[in-house]
């Protein structure tokens, strides 16, 4: 019983220590790929701040714009999520197959958020309560 309590205390302590590892970074301290992506697709928006978030096994970078829009990048600078609260995700930043599918099947829809993980893209639209999932190939798909 003592070992179990000790283990739980250690586990809780580790969670507290790791929980807040956000570190402000300048735009120039972001990975080069992230800097290029922002300059190419979000040049019309002003960066409010950027931060590095260190987890136990991973590092991510967040870029927040003055208008509230947010980008998240992995440690190599590849985008993981684009979330636009007061704007739209630029079509140039979205994979071409997804843009084509959305224009064909939802001509009035505008992309507000897109997130990618290891298996798929998740897309949310303005004016639609639904979200759509796309396989890495860009094909509309069911969730795995």
Language-model regions: role of each:
Residues 20-144:
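Interaction-mediating elements
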Residues 1-22, 38:
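Bacterial Sec-dependent N-terminal signal peptides
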């Amino acid at each position: 019983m003592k070992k179990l309590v000790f283990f739980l205390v250690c586990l809780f302590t580790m969670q507290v220590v790791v929980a807040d590892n956000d570190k402000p970074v300048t735009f120039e301290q972001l990975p080069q790929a992230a800097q290029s992506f922002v300059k190419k697709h979000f040049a019309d928006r002003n960066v409010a701040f950027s931060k590095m978030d260190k987890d136990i096994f991973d590092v991510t970078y967040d870029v927040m714009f003055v208008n509230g829009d947010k980008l998240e990048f992995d440690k190599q600078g590849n985008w993981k999520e684009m979330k636009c609260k007061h704007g739209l995700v630029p079509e140039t930043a979205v994979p071409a197959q997804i843009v084509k599918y959305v224009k064909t099947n939802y001509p009035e829809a505008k992309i507000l958020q897109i997130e990618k993980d290891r298996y798929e893209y998740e897309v949310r639209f303005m004016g639609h309560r639904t979200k759509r999932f796309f396989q890495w190939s860009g094909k509309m798909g069911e969730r795995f």
